[in-house]
């Protein structure tokens, strides 16, 4: 039926529009680091969310004393050669133990608890797509000032070729080799994502042209071929989107976690560009189903309405 074929072609055109929007925008994956940045700017940088507990200071590992202090006999009740790290000693107050006899005893300070190690790293609020990764507008005033001064670029292009990134010099050889292998794996996932979604758009566009010609010439076989092409394009789109999700999960679980993992305060998730791509996938599969169903319905109706020949008729 021409109505089903026309509806399938309209859905395929809408799917092409959604896929084009997804390809041309950068909101596939979004991160929001404002809550993490605000927490790290507070004094101490400690988390106060329910259910999170810091390790008490008395359970922290002990630090050995310098060799000069180990020669002296240990005090009573304290093992020789070890001492607790106190805030007074961190501030350089070394004369507490050699105070005069008549001096007033000072209260001992509590062991110093280090801040969150994630606060030593800078996390930005970003949006990323297939081609670019950009800083989100209005999420960080310091970054906005650097962008206005030209020190930091608003967007950086996503690389589809291998480049060795700079790594900390204190990493072991095995860790460095693992990071290099993970970079190759992430690069292959990005290439598969871009390649398969490009194939999907090309196949859907070609199928739409074949379907339009089939509707104009009332050729059922061309409409059937167009439906098969739509289903093939939807399959390529499924592979592309699944590979994109796998690539994002792989980036978040890379080793070592101290370099590639995100703190819990940073909210991250998929953006509206990803949902446009999934919507285009659904419309593509639906259009393929309608275009392959229309020729079979028209063939069955023509067989039912075919006039019966009388006996002796040629």
UniProtKB/Swiss-Prot annotation:
Transmembrane segments: 194-214, 228-248, 274-294
One Pfam family per UniProt: Claudin_2
Coiled-coil features, chain-numbered ranges: none
InterPro entries from the UniProt entry: PMP22/EMP/MP20/Claudin, T178A/B
Subcellular location: Membrane
Membrane topology: Multi-pass membrane protein
Domain of life, source organism: Eukaryota
GO CC list: membrane
Annotated Basic residues bias: 36-45
Alphabetical keyword list: Membrane, Signal, Transmembrane, Transmembrane helix
Region Disordered, annotated ranges: 32-83
Signal peptide extent: 1-24
Family label: Belongs to the TMEM178 family.
Name of the protein in question: Transmembrane protein 178B
Native organism: Xenopus tropicalis (Western clawed frog)
């Amino acid at each position: 039926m021409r109505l089903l074929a026309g509806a399938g072609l309209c859905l395929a055109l809408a799917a092409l529009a959604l896929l084009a929007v997804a390809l041309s925008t950068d909101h596939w994956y979004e991160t929001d680091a404002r809550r993490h940045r605000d927490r790290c700017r507070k004094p101490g940088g400690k988390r106060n969310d329910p259910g999170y507990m810091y390790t008490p200071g008395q359970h922290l590992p002990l630090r050995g004393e310098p060799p000069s202090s180990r020669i002296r006999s240990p005090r009573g009740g304290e093992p020789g050669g070890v001492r607790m790290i106190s805030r007074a000693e961190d501030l350089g107050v070394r004369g507490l133990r050699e105070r005069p006899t008549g001096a007033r005893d000072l209260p001992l300070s509590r062991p110093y608890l280090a801040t969150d190690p994630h606060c030593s790293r800078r996390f930005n609020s970003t949006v990323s797509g297939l081609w670019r990764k950009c800083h989100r507008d209005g999420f960080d005033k310091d970054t906005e000032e650097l962008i206005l001064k030209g020190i930091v670029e608003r967007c950086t292009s996503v690389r589809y070729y291998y480049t060795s990134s700079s790594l900390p010099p204190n990493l072991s050889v095995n860790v460095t080799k693992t990071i290099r292998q993970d970079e190759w794996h992430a690069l292959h996932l990005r290439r598969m994502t871009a390649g398969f979604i490009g194939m999907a758009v090309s196949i859907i566009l070609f199928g739409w042209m074949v379907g339009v010609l089939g509707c104009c010439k009332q050729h059922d076989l061309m409409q059937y071929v167009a439906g098969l092409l739509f289903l093939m394009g939807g399959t390529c789109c499924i592979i592309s989107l699944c590979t994109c999700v796998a690539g994002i999960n792989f980036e978040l679980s890379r080793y070592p976690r101290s370099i590639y993992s995100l703190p819990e305060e940073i909210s991250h998730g998929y953006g509206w560009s990803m949902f446009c791509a999934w919507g285009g996938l659904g419309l593509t599969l639906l259009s393929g189903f309608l275009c392959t169903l229309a020729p079979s319905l028209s063939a069955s109706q023509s067989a039912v309405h075919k006039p019966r020949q009388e006996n002796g008729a040629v």
